[in-house]
Regions:
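Short, hydrophobic alpha-helical segments
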Residues: 138-142, 167, 244-251
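Amphipathic terminal alpha-helices
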Residues: 213-260
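Non-catalytic, hydrophobic alpha-helical segments
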Residues: 130, 134, 149, 159, ...
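Terminal hydrophobic/aromatic helix or amphipathic segment near a protein terminus
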Residues: 160-216
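Oxidoreductase cofactor-interface core, primarily capturing Rossmann-like NAD(P)-dependent enzymes
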Residues: 50-146, 150-152
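Short glycine-/acidic-enriched loop or helix-start segments at secondary-structure transitions
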Residues: 45-47, 92-94, 159
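Substrate-binding strand-loop-helix patch
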Residues: 121-128, 147-166, 180-185
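Conserved Rossmann-fold NAD(P)-dependent oxidoreductase catalytic core, especially the SDR/UDP-sugar
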Residues: 2, 7, 18-62, 81
Length: 260
């Protein structure tokens, strides 16, 4: 059964409302439980309704819809769990890490004596720990359950110190936290480019500043309940950033992340 579940979880990550229904109609005939790899932005939307995230961000709205559709299929003979996953560190052989975009962003400030970045923080875990909670959810979760997942919580300042160390620039880089309005000003060019190209971003550009200013932390007790064990998050961040830097520098060529 686990092989079917793993196949299902890999596909479900890249689909939203309508396709989700078709997948569940098919999968429910084959297995007794399903694990959906969701997003911790859904957790934030439920924890902070005052931020009105589903109104502002199509991506977050689609994740909430995905949970709703998934749970509609749960019954006495079919368990559905959604893992609300945060940022994941570690490498996947042959794949380009999503953190290349971070290198592109902070590289522009390398010549400055400091880096300006939002003042919030994020939950995170390693690739291995994701595998552990997937197996745990498949074996232990009952009914319709959303699991907010995290094993570590770092402020952006703490995280960037590790990033700069991984880039060979030491851990004493000065990080200046900026207010959301300043980040919105900095993203003005991106917003203009999207408007000119007719692009609707899954995460609203203006609203992103408010999300980045939040300490989006999650207790580790949920991940541990599903069987996650301790790992070296600093080493995992190092691995992700080193590969991302190599991709940025053009010294390696890897496949981009995509839905399959």
């Amino acid at each position: 059964m686990l092989s079917s579940l793993h196949l299902f979880t890999m596909h479900i990550t890249s689909i939203t409302f309508s396709p989700s229904r078709e997948y569940f109609l098919f999968v429910k005939r084959l297995v007794k439980s399903a694990v959906v790899l969701g997003s911790y932005f859904a957790y934030l939307a439920k924890e902070r309704p005052d931020m009105e995230l589903t109104k502002k961000h199509p991506y977050i709205r689609s994740r909430i819809d995905q949970e709703r559709v998934a749970f509609s299929f749960a019954d006495d003979s079919f368990d559905v769990s959604v893992l609300e996953l945060p940022y994941i560190f570690g490498t996947q052989p042959g794949r380009k890490p999503v953190w290349v975009i971070l290198i592109e962003q902070i590289k522009r400030m390398d010549k400055l004596p400091f880096t300006m970045y939002p003042g919030g923080g994020t939950a995170m875990l390693t690739v291995r720990q994701v595998g552990e909670v997937i197996v745990g959810a498949a074996e232990k979760s009952k009914g319709a359950t959303a699991w907010p997942i995290s094993m570590y919580n770092l402020t952006w300042k703490e995280f960037l110190k590790i990033v700069y160390a991984a880039r060979g620039m030491g851990e004493d880089r000065k990080i200046i936290s900026v207010a959301p309005w300043m980040m919105r000003m900095g993203l003005g060019g991106v917003k203009k480019e999207y408007a000119e190209k007719g692009i609707e971003s899954g995460i609203d550009v203006d609203g992103l500043a408010d999300i980045m200013d939040v300490n989006l932390f999650i207790p580790d007790r949920f991940a541990k309940e599903l069987g996650a064990t301790d790992d070296d998050i600093k080493s995992a961040i190092f691995d992700s950033i080193k590969v991302s830097q190599a991709v940025y520098d053009g010294t390696v060529e890897l496949l981009g992340m995509k839905g399959e």
